[in-house]
């Protein structure tokens, strides 16, 4: 059973983890699928602490549908970050 937007309506989360296709400091987190973006957006709005799991190749990329602002989540990432990204407190490099 796949979680739909309707299924997600009454659910509240203490912590949540999401993937993303694109991360932009100015434009936020994005994905190419409208339904996926709607579920992610709604579930993030109902979550106390949001985490985005993404490798470093997702930074400075933008897919067609935005689901959250950059400051709405802590990004957990692997790989080397560009020096300009190291100043953001919501980006954590996992080794």
Protein language model features and the residues they cover:
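Conserved phosphate- and dinucleotide-binding cores of soluble alpha/beta proteins
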Residues: 4-95
């Amino acid at each position: 059973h796949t979680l739909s937007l309707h299924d997600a309506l009454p659910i509240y989360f203490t912590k949540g983890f999401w993937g993303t296709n694109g991360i932009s400091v100015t434009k936020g987190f994005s994905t190419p699928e409208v339904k996926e973006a709607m579920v992610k957006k709604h579930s993030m709005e109902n979550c106390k602490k949001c985490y985005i799991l993404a490798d470093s190749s997702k930074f400075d990329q933008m897919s067609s549908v935005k689901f959250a602002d950059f400051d709405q989540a802590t990004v957990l990432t692997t790989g080397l970050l560009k020096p300009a990204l190291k100043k953001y407190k919501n980006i954590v490099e996992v080794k």
